[in-house]
């Protein structure tokens, strides 16, 4: 069906012979839901109305039904048809199909309930019901089927039982082949699911929901909703099984997804809408259903028959914001409420079975122009007795410019008949020759090329008339302390459009000046300010217009309100302040605000900085007794008063301190920890009653039971105390009292505490006897044991007084210390221990061991050549040593003995470095050293191996292997691979202009190229070899001379044709080179010759060559020759030849031949230019290579 659901018309009441489909009842509280029942064309749908009668609705139609209690509505089916409820991928479908003979052989067909809530229940159908949400209906998939839009789609996990058996009615034959195929397909689905539904009763639908309903809509399932069902059959509760049922469900899901994709592709294949009948405010949009290619094998029953279309338009461009103007099944719609002369863009989107396709292409159209909108009513700008001036604004022209306005009036008759007053382009008009105090009604219309607009609202204006009448007396709106707000009304009988002004006059009786104006204006209200409080004022009002003033209104009296009173005086104390009470008094405020004071309120706050105020008194008296206070507390009090004008500010606060009393008794002190032998640690808490003052002191008293001698052992503010100087194992009594600024309170009850046995007393200092430099004997005496025998002694020994360690622990009275260092101070002390603990250590005793030979020399090492500053040091025959000074063990070190092999050891003085000379080059020595003092020689140090370096090498022979005018390549030594890996370095030097030799190269290479030299110049060089032994001697001086430079290469010569047998060759001119003249040599190669022949040699830079043969190739090249004048004779230096130039001689002919020569000449010029470019690139590359070589030579090698 592709139409909107029509209104439900009343139809004939069906007979009771039509079978009725009864549905199971659902228990629990069901949510209110909407069911959209679709009736196909040619079919009928029957419902029961509220009055109990039956109504038959013929298709095509859509019937919305509501269910408040979750029950399935009553649905009638025609004879010969039976309804079936099936579950298809999580969606319930109610299908009405013809009955088959084999379907009801004699029993009832049992249809299992799918795992979903049942169909919503039935409610009386109203005359008008809003359409359901778009996502709850979709097109019908076949004849006689109820599509899925009948059933709201939502998830659920509740369990339901089987449906009751349904009675079979109707005919036994099928109506047509299409119905038979539909029935067979649905029956197969029903039988396939019959075995799997029982196992899926407790599981949600396995199919993904394409269009889930939100819980806020009528057909959604709210959270926590009870959807349990009751069935007349047996209720089964099983978990979802595995195996065949699940695999079959997965296959169905995949099939459903493929069907959804195919449907979505079909819905997206829709053409853009067609726009017709475009008017100023309406347009007709039409479109076609999605196109589909139906083949011979295509199942036509799978093609959707009903689509839902959504039409969207936009007036902000194709990519602007679209709004939906239509949703339904029609193929056309008339869009209303459009704006004239506006561009619109429209597109359509198709939906089927809750699946939407892509929107169509955009169709653009423009609405027509039309008459203007009705203008606003004209307003008055000036008014006199005989004229009115009106003005108005232009309205929307709707696409056509407004060219005139029509102003009509009723001529003051008031009968509703209007005639033309003005017609033109102006936007204002002055109407003259009017009557005074007369009302005239006007209306306005605008006109453009499309027609006349509607008239504006009618407006009534009056001309000026007589003077204003007397207004009523002003009324009081509100009153304040210094202001009065008044209001008055317009005089009766005054036209509504007449401009009237008012004068408000006030009289202050105390001033004696009478009435004075306070306001002059058009407003009907005014607030008179700057008045005095509690004062009576008289007011009257006068109205006036352009014709004159009215008489004053009747005089009225109004009084300002009283002000809030001032703050009372600061309260003061009356009489003596007691520990728990005192009396206060206060004076009334100096300013009562213009009215009598009714009440005084006293507030109190505990503490000097408290912010919490409590009311303790409210009355008319001016004194109050504050009682039930705490001793020793600070209180702040303040007073404020209340009058007719309000509440005053609070007075300044009074600070009162109640006197304190002595504190109450404390609890007895208690023992903190375990009792010790000579001291007890006691702890206590403050008393429960502090007397109103902080506890400042505690007093602790002690006495023994035997002597009953009292003694105060502690007085202070702490809550704990350690009582010392006690005897071990004795009983002591203690009692406590607390004190504040008022004095001490009573003592607490006494407590008895017994001391524990104590550790031994402090031992006497031990005695130390040194037996040798590495051994000492320590002994001590037995101390006082304090009631327990000493079980062991602990001896601490160390080289520092504050860092000693226990070296002996045992019952003995002596100990021997071994492994000591000579001439070293040691510290020791001893401690006694018994069962009660360890006693205090004795005083520390210091002793010093006797002196001995020095310790082992450490850090013996060899020095490098750079670390030795002596000029007599030669690494080939000398070895330098250094070491650190060892411990002298109490006797100053007098020297060191160095042992370096079979030779006699060397004795040196008190030095820490020394070099041994007279050694053999390139020889290894084993060296060790020992320190000497007055007591003898110490032990030798560790042995090190040092080797003397070989002798420096001799300088090599220097040779020049290559040269040029600016470079010399020098070579020395053997340049083999073995020599390159040797440790020998070479230092090449050259003499500069000042006669000094400067370094050119230092490194292991055997060749070096000297660059940037001058031509024909002699240079002096020398070289020396270096190795790890040092630098060898310099070689003799070598002199090498650079030759003169040859001229540079010339550019390609230029050839100019003279005639058929003659041409002129021109080449580049070079300047003389350092005084030497330069001549030129020109060569030619004719035809297929392989060698160039000289045709000219001389100083000229051009040559005319004759004897050219026609159609023959000639190649010319030139070079420069430097003529050097040497002492030995004349010498020519020939430079490189230029690149050859090709020239072809041809006969002079008409313009065609000339063109050929031109082409050949152009080709020759191009060849010359290419050669020049190649030469420039080559020169730049050479310069760049030289620059890189210089940088490497300067920064890397040096």
From Swiss-Prot:
Predominant localisation class: Golgi
Keywords for the protein's UniProt record, in alphabetical order: Golgi apparatus, Membrane, Repeat, Transmembrane, Transmembrane helix
InterPro entries the UniProt entry points to: E3_ligase_FN3/SPRY, FN3_dom, FN3_sf, Ig-like_fold
Low complexity: compositionally biased ranges: 229-247
Region (Disordered): 189-256, 553-574
Coiled coil: none
Membrane topology: Single-pass membrane protein
Subcellular location: Golgi apparatus membrane
Gene Ontology CC: Golgi membrane
Top-level taxon of the source organism: Eukaryota
Protein family membership: Belongs to the FNDC3 family.
Official protein name in the record: Fibronectin type-III domain-containing protein 3a
Annotated source species: Gallus gallus (Chicken)
